[in-house]
């Protein structure tokens, strides 16, 4: 079976041994020519999967090595009987680390007013964030009405409850499905009711927050974001407005990238009735001593202000966004730096 895969994905050789043959693409404009006689397209969330890309090809499977699937035109793929494989949950730990790093920076700058936190979206990422904040004894408001309809043991708070929070963590999937669409969920009416000094950390998708409404709100609300409308052609006004702004890398730890490929590989092998291969894993980093506080430990591993300043000072914002995202490849999950005793001491770290 012939696979065309994004060259930036790690561990492809071990994840797809014979009978698979892997060809790599480095840029999206290489795909139309390389896709001939391929059975599987293995991509990342940066590639739009639709009829324009695939209409002249006869592939059988689209596999995305990412949790999010809003870059995929599902109706088109279904109309062509093309199977879809995703890697949901692959980067949940990495995104939770990112949120903690943002909180570490904000707390160090004395910008966090209290310990009441709202989490929007309780999928695998939101649940990871919840577990850490709960272990660190934050007061939590959990907003996920669709989850409440599926899981009778879960009770969602209301949007009004979120207005009392000191900070909000956004982890919902982007969709427009009634009765609880996430598209433009955080709009002008919601934003203007937040208490002054409230912090929003968006590590989901740009379209959940109405960027125009945010821009017209003034500076009372602090905005920290990893995601934007129209990536990579992001709005320079949002970058200027944001306290922290990073190039969509929250889920880009080395462990998350390897896990994404492994999850896709397992699903494809299972689909074809093949035994699982041995998967490559990233080399473990050196251990850190826990003789500092949680803020310094988190920021010693990843400090979001560095990429924030790179974006804010960029001449060509789109180019800087893509370059920074591509070069973000040395971060490990926080838990790989500590033993279990250190994690018990500082539960926000893992």
From Swiss-Prot:
SUPFAM superfamilies xrefs: Formate/glycerate dehydrogenase catalytic domain-like, NAD(P)-binding Rossmann-fold domains
Q: Where does it localize?
A: Cytoplasm
* UniProt catalytic activity: 4-phospho-D-erythronate + NAD(+) = (R)-3-hydroxy-2-oxo-4-phosphooxybutanoate + NADH + H(+)
Task: Give me any GO biological process, just one.
Answer: pyridoxine biosynthetic process
Q: Which UniProt keywords apply?
A: Cytoplasm, NAD, Oxidoreductase, Pyridoxine biosynthesis
The biological pathway it contributes to is: Cofactor biosynthesis; pyridoxine 5'-phosphate biosynthesis; pyridoxine 5'-phosphate from D-erythrose 4-phosphate: step 2/5
Cytoplasm recorded as keyword: yes
**Which enzyme type, at the first EC level?**
oxidoreductase
Give the signal peptide, or none: none
Which residues does the annotation say bind NAD(+)?
124-125, 144, 203-205, 226, 251
A molecular function (GO) term: NAD binding
Enzyme Commission number, as recorded: 1.1.1.290
One Pfam family recorded for the sequence: 2-Hacid_dh_C
Residues annotated as binding substrate are: 45, 66
Major place of residence: cytoplasm
Q: Where is the active site?
A: 205, 231, 248 (proton donor)
| Function (record text) | Catalyzes the oxidation of erythronate-4-phosphate to 3-hydroxy-2-oxo-4-phosphonooxybutanoate.
Q: Which family does it belong to?
A: Belongs to the D-isomer specific 2-hydroxyacid dehydrogenase family. PdxB subfamily.
Q: What is the protein's quaternary organization?
A: Homodimer.
Which PANTHER family does the UniProt record give? Answer: 2-HYDROXYACID DEHYDROGENASE YGL185C-RELATED, 2-HYDROXYACID DEHYDROGENASE-RELATED
Q: What is this protein called?
A: Erythronate-4-phosphate dehydrogenase
Q: What is the lineage of its organism?
A: Bacteria, Pseudomonadati, Pseudomonadota, Gammaproteobacteria, Legionellales
């Amino acid at each position: 079976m012939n696979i065309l895969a994004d060259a930036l994905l790690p561990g492809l050789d071990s994840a797809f041994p014979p009978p698979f043959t892997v060809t790599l693409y480095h840029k999206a404009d290489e795909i139309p020519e390389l896709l001939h006689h391929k059975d599987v397209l293995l991509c990342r969330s940066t590639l739009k999967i639709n009829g324009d890309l695939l209409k002249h090809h006869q592939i059988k499977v689209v596999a995305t090595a990412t949790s999010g699937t809003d870059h995929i035109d599902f109706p088109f793929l279904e109309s062509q009987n093309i199977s879809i494989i995703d890697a949901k949950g692959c980067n949940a730990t990495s995104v939770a680390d990112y949120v903690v790093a943002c909180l570490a920076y904000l707390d160090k700058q004395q910008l966090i007013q209290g310990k009441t936190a709202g989490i929007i979206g309780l999928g695998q990422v939101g649940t990871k964030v919840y577990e850490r904040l709960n272990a660190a004894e934050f007061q939590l408001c959990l907003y996920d009405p669709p989850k409440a309809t599926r899981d009778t043991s879960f009770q969602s708070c209301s949007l009004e409850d979120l207005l009392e929070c000191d900070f909000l963590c956004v982890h919902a999937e982007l969709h427009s499905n009634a009765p609880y669409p996430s598209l433009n969920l955080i709009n002008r009416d919601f934003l203007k009711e937040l208490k002054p000094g409230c912090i929003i950390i968006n590590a989901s998708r740009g379209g959940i927050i109405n960027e125009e409404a945010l821009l017209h709100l003034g500076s009372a609300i602090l905005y920290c974001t990893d995601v934007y409308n129209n990536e990579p052609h992001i709005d320079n006004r949002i970058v200027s407005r944001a306290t922290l702004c990073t190039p969509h890398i929250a889920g880009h730890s080395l462990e998350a990238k390897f896990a994404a490929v492994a999850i896709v590989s397992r699903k494809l092998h299972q689909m074809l009735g093949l035994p699982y291969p041995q998967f490559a894993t990233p080399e473990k980093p050196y251990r850190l001593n826990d003789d500092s506080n949680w803020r310094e430990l988190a920021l010693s591993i990843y400090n979001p202000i560095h990429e924030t300043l790179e974006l804010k000072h960029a001449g060509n914002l789109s180019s800087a966004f893509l370059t920074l995202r591509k070069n973000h490849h040395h971060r490990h999950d926080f838990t790989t730096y500590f033993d279990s005793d250190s994690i018990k001491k500082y539960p926000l770290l893992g």
